[in-house]
A protein has these predicted regions:
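Sec-dependent signal peptide hydrophobic core
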Residues: 5-13
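Acidic/polar, low-complexity intrinsically disordered N-terminal segments immediately downstream
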Residues: 3-5, 22-121, 165-167, 181-182, ...
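C-terminal motif of bacterial Sec signal peptides marking the signal peptidase cleavage site
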Residues: 16-20
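Signal that preferentially marks extracellular ectodomain short beta-strand elements
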Residues: 122-167
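Internal, hydrophobic beta-strand segments that form the core of beta-sheet-rich folds
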Residues: 163-187
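Flexible, surface-exposed loop regions and adjacent strand-edge segments
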Residues: 189-192
Length: 229
């Protein structure tokens, strides 16, 4: 009798396990998106467009005429979708942020560059357009509120004195899938800042998290530097 009852239990367990497997097999496979870039940004093949020339980006319009060439530098990169995946992307949103190297480095508020739904995409800026809308995040050491400074000079003809050699413009990406869901590989922290030094922190801005990957394929960097001779 005990043997028969034990056999019955084993049969019941086996049947339950089989039924469970069958039910699980009917569930849709999860989308493993948490750390999977869907595009790979690529720098321009033109080496002059692979960085931002410091002197030409910083110069006033008058000083620019004394430089050679007397034009603002251009930064350019492109990207295409990775069609090897089953994930269907409808739109790629591109953002830019200003990063000041230091200890610790700071990253300013991000600004939307554009939303793209036709691929491949080539994005090209002259330095004035690149600096437009960007802000430097300043964290005082005296404990007062963090504040932001506009990078581009208020007078379009004036020098852009706030940029330095070694500064970076960081481009990051978000994907909107065909089902409407959003993929975010570069976490954002909403941060309260002041719009003036010493003022109250009453403005909230979206800032890249400190742990954000800023290297390809997660992001693209435009380095402000001198030409390599």
């Amino acid at each position: 009798m005990k043997h028969s009852f034990r056999s019955f239990l084993l049969t019941l367990v086996a049947f339950s396990t089989l039924a469970s497997c069958r039910d699980t097999s009917k569930l849709p496979a999860p989308k493993l998106l948490g750390s999977v870039p869907l595009i790979t940004p690529v720098l321009s093949a033109d080496t002059a467009k692979q960085y931002i020339n410091f002197s030409r980006a910083r110069a006033s319009n008058a000083a620019l005429t004394n430089l050679s060439p007397a034009t603002r530098p251009i930064f350019e990169f492109s990207f295409d979708l990775d069609n090897s995946r089953d994930i269907k992307v409808a739109t790629v949103e591109v953002y830019k942020s200003f990063r000041r190297t230091g200890n610790p480095p700071t990253v300013g508020p991000r600004v939307l560059v554009g939303a793209y739904n036709s691929f491949p995409v080539t994005i090209s800026f002259n330095s004035q357009d690149l600096l437009t809308g960007l802000q430097r995040l300043v964290i005082p050491t005296d404990g007062s509120a963090a504040y932001v400074l506009n990078l581009k000079a208020a007078n379009p003809a004036a020098s852009n004195l706030l940029i330095q050699r070694g500064d970076l413009i960081v481009f990051t990406f978000e994907y909107i899938l065909e089902d409407g869901s959003r993929v975010i590989l570069t976490p954002i922290i909403n941060t309260k800042v002041s719009l003036t030094a010493g003022g109250p922190a009453n403005t909230t801005v979206p800032v890249l998290a400190a742990t954000t990957q800023i290297n390809k394929p997660y992001a693209m960097e435009a380095v402000i530097r001198d030409p390599i001779k």
